[in-house]
From Swiss-Prot:
GO terms for cellular component: cytosol. Belongs to the PurH family. This is Bifunctional purine biosynthesis protein PurH. GO terms for biological process: 'de novo' IMP biosynthetic process.
Length: 501
């Protein structure tokens, strides 16, 4: 009995050459619908699926291969005499190769289609054949990825058959694909109906292996969401090397921080912590303000902009060593300047941050929560003195920055410049002292969480702070309010805490 391959693919790249190869090895081909037509038109001797099933395609193509004469041929164990006896009695031909790629649900779910249109891209017959073939991998070669055509061809050329090791790997690829495919469908169907479902289905596809992880002895890779076109899976690399693991984490924060602001803004960042943040009339002004606050820490840093980068800004940036620049666009002459630094990673972003959930792994579990996308609940002035309009503008600026600083976090600012940033401390007074020491001339102070004691207010007064913004909610809020009144400082509560761990 001749060996037989069943080919049914949506993506036809490479399938014609692969089919020709199979035919050259005396393997007959069965196919369906559009694949059958494509192979036939290109001179391949191919059997249409309904010649096997004696049953026509029906329901607008929804039912083509869902038939015992197909699946028995895939699932029969060749060494099982009873299985083979049934096939012989029923005149069922074994299927030795299953070549299937799926309807592009991953792509279509992100397009501007109706719910019903997206549902039509949920593949049923394809996954069923793939799963059957993958289960019976000892006897069936299953190909779900066009990149594996050459792998199979090479083994058949060299060894006359596909090794059990390779068949098992191809089987694993199928179930890996199906878990992502089914996960994407589950998330699509559940939508907002169940915010935290019983089973967490995450669907990500590998973008690339990374040179190493957070440290050189750790291996790493980066995966892209199949459901969402976010900032970090759609950017273009215009210059420089591939991003490292640490680059990915840092760029994410720099881009998010810069995009907190409506006006032109720049965020300079090192080790996942902002070291300079400023707004200005344009990218150049914002960058220079951020740079001048801390020209030491910015060295080797990540720079995020929310506006196009011009030549003047580029000329300033290439004066120092930087790892990455992230912006929505670049003038041509600016790009020419930046490309003089061959290792400088220059990224063009197409999407503003849009994540609604974030996940963190702990040993044996994953924590899932809403992204911290809300800045304030409401502004409530709690002191005798009210902040001026300029102070209020700076207070909101400071709160936008402090969101991105590791807790406990304090930011002091003036005129749209984060003059002092203190964070990552186990009490609140230390980051206050750090921020004030660096932030000479600051007039406002922003805190990511409430004050447990009045000591922060007293320190702020010593440092010349005129207004404070914090979430409120401490049992001793009144002590801090009284301290502000004593020092003539305005203070507002926001109702929202911004811990970052």
């Amino acid at each position: 009995m001749k060996k037989r391959a069943l080919i049914s693919v949506f993506n036809k790249d490479g399938v014609l050459d692969f089919a020709k190869f199979l035919v050259s090895k005396d393997i007959e081909i069965v196919s369906t619908g559009g694949t059958y037509k494509y192979l036939k038109e290109n001179g391949i001797d191919v059997i249409e699926i309904n010649e096997v099933t004696n049953f026509p395609e029906m329901l607008d193509g929804r039912v083509k291969t869902l038939h015992p004469l197909v699946h028995a041929g895939i699932l029969a164990i060749r060494d099982n005499k009873e299985h083979m006896k049934v096939l012989e009695e029923r005149e069922i031909h074994t299927i030795d190769y299953v070549v299937v790629n799926l309807y592009p649900f991953f792509e279509k779910v992100k397009e501007d289609l109706t719910f019903e249109e997206k549902v039509e891209f949920i593949d049923i017959g394809g996954p069923t054949m793939l799963r059957a073939a993958a289960k019976n991998f000892q006897d069936v070669v299953v190909i779900s990825n066009i990149n594996d055509y050459e792998v199979v061809k090479s083994e058949i050329k060299n060894d006359g058959q596909v090794s059990l090791k390779t068949k098992k790997k191809l089987s694993g690829k199928v179930f890996n694909l199906m878990s992502a495919y089914d996960g994407a469908i589950a998330n699509f169907m559940l939508g907002d109906e169940e915010e935290y479902p019983e089973y967490l289905s995450v669907s990500y596809k590998k973008m690339q292996n990374l040179r190493y992880g957070e440290n050189s002895h750790q291996s790493a890779a980066v995966y892209s969401s199949t459901m969402v076109d976010g900032a970090m899976n759609t950017f273009e690399t215009l210059n420089g090397k591939e991003l490292s693991y640490n680059n990915f984490k840092d760029v994410d924060i720099a881009w998010k921080c810069a995009n907190e602001f409506d006006e032109p803004a720049c965020c300079a960042l090192k080790h996942n912590t902002p070291c300079g943040v400023a707004t200005g009339e344009n990218s150049y002004e914002a960058y220079m303000k951020a740079y001048e606050v801390d020209p030491t820490s910015i060295f080797g840093g990540i720079i995020g902009f929310n506006r196009k980068v011009d030549k003047k800004t580029a000329q300033e940036m290439v004066k120092i060593f930087l790892e990455v620049i992230a912006a929505p666009d670049y003038d041509e002459d600016a790009l020419e300047v930046l490309k003089t630094k061959k290792n400088l990673r220059v990224l063009k972003f197409h999407n503003t941050p849009k994540a609604e959930k974030c996940m963190v792994t702990v040993d044996g579990a994953i924590l899932v929560q809403d992204e911290d996308n809300k800045l304030i609940d409401e502004i409530k002035v709690v002191t005798e003195k009210k902040p001026s309009d300029e102070e209020m503008k700076d207070l909101l600026f400071g709160m936008k920055v402090v969101k991105y600083v590791k807790s406990n976090a304090i930011v002091v600012a003036h005129n749209g410049i984060a003059l002092g940033i203190g964070g990552g401390q186990v009490n609140r007074i230390w980051p206050t002292e750090d921020a004030l020491r660096r932030g000479k001339g600051a007039t406002i102070l922003a805190s990511d969480a409430f004050f447990p004691f009045r000591d922060v207010v007293d320190k702020a007064a010593e440092g010349g702070i005129k207004a404070i913004i914090q979430p409120g909610g401490s049992m001793r809020d009144q002590e801090s309010i009284d301290a502000c009144n004593e020092h003539g400082i305005a203070m507002v509560f926001t109702g929202f805490r911004h811990f970052k761990h």
